[in-house]
Amino acid sequence: MAKTKYGERHRKGLWSPEEDEKLRSFILSYGHSCWTTVPIKAGLQRNGKSCRLRWINYLRPGLKRDMISAEEEETILTFHSSLGNKWSQIAKFLPGRTDNEIKNYWHSHLKKKWLKSQSLQDAKSISPPSSSSSSLVACGKRNPETLISNHVFSFQRLLENKSSSPSQESNGNNSHQCSSAPEIPRLFFSEWLSSSYPHTDYSSEFTDSKHSQAPNVEETLSAYEEMGDVDQFHYNEMMINNSNWTLNDIVFGSKCKKQEHHIYREASDCNSSAEFFSPSTTT
């Protein structure tokens, strides 16, 4: 028993059948406009909150006393996924069931089932790659032609790799030899030209090799035109830029070329003079 502010004592605990009958008969006769006055008028030593919960959850007409069916479970699971733990709103879609009853049934039965379904959905969301791979294997089993073509293609690729491996090794060895060989110094065109033609003064046209300016190509080209060998000018310039020749090769090669050119001119002059003094011309 608990005392109120007016000194009255209120009962707590289980409701007796006599108390249930008093509350039911009073509410059916007079209604429940104000729950604080209901226990006083009904002659009950209970507070208004206890009377309200007893009426809503146990005594009001239309309540279902049997167990919750499978259809009701599906309804609870469906609306719980969208509404969450709002039991009073879920109870509106289940006539005859109270929010307290739905909440108790959820925590005692449906929560475990819901957790299992969530774990299965997570497993299904992770498993599609394996299912796709299994489908590919199944397609390969159903279509043996694709398997044969795949094997032939892989065999061809293996042969190509084997045939290309010696060339790759030789290329690797050549590159290693080239990297280990001493690097040929790069020649500037002014250095080569001064060494090839020492009688010509190019000091006014060229500066230091590290800070060299562009040579006067027109004068150099005109010198080669006098020799009648413009192609040799372009060929020497290309070989110098590519650094494929050493200094000795370029210098001696150009000197030999120059000597051959002079010898050829002297020979042609001799031939022309011999023809001029031939007996046929004198007579």
UniProtKB/Swiss-Prot annotation:
<keyword id="KW-0832">Ubl conjugation</keyword>
<comment type="subunit">
    <text>Binds to FHY1 and FHL. Interacts with COP1.</text>
</comment>
<dbReference type="GO" id="GO:0045893">
    <property type="term" value="P:positive regulation of DNA-templated transcription"/>
</dbReference>
<keyword id="KW-0805">Transcription regulation</keyword>
<dbReference type="InterPro" id="IPR009057">
    <property type="entry name" value="Homeodomain-like_sf"/>
</dbReference>
<dbReference type="InterPro" id="IPR051953">
    <property type="entry name" value="Plant_SW-associated_TFs"/>
</dbReference>
<dbReference type="GO" id="GO:0005634">
    <property type="term" value="C:nucleus"/>
</dbReference>
<feature type="DNA-binding region" description="H-T-H motif">
    <location>
        <begin position="35"/>
        <end position="59"/>
    </location>
</feature>
<dbReference type="Pfam" id="PF00249">
    <property type="entry name" value="Myb_DNA-binding"/>
</dbReference>
<feature type="DNA-binding region" description="H-T-H motif">
    <location>
        <begin position="87"/>
        <end position="110"/>
    </location>
</feature>
<dbReference type="InterPro" id="IPR017930">
    <property type="entry name" value="Myb_dom"/>
</dbReference>
<dbReference type="GO" id="GO:0010018">
    <property type="term" value="P:far-red light signaling pathway"/>
</dbReference>
<dbReference type="GO" id="GO:0009585">
    <property type="term" value="P:red, far-red light phototransduction"/>
</dbReference>
<keyword id="KW-0539">Nucleus</keyword>
<dbReference type="GO" id="GO:0009639">
    <property type="term" value="P:response to red or far red light"/>
</dbReference>
<keyword id="KW-0607">Phytochrome signaling pathway</keyword>
<keyword id="KW-0010">Activator</keyword>
<keyword id="KW-0677">Repeat</keyword>
<protein>
    <recommendedName>
        <fullName>Transcription factor LAF1</fullName>
    </recommendedName>
</protein>
<dbReference type="GO" id="GO:0016607">
    <property type="term" value="C:nuclear speck"/>
</dbReference>
<keyword id="KW-0804">Transcription</keyword>
<keyword id="KW-0238">DNA-binding</keyword>
<feature type="domain" description="HTH myb-type 2">
    <location>
        <begin position="60"/>
        <end position="114"/>
    </location>
</feature>
<dbReference type="GO" id="GO:0003700">
    <property type="term" value="F:DNA-binding transcription factor activity"/>
</dbReference>
<comment type="function">
    <text>Transcription factor that promotes photomorphogenesis in the light by participating in the transmission of phytochrome A (phyA) signals to downstream responses. Probably acts by activating expression of light-induced genes. In darkness, its degradation prevents the activation of light-induced genes.</text>
</comment>
<feature type="domain" description="HTH myb-type 1">
    <location>
        <begin position="7"/>
        <end position="59"/>
    </location>
</feature>
<dbReference type="GO" id="GO:0003677">
    <property type="term" value="F:DNA binding"/>
</dbReference>
<dbReference type="InterPro" id="IPR001005">
    <property type="entry name" value="SANT/Myb"/>
</dbReference>
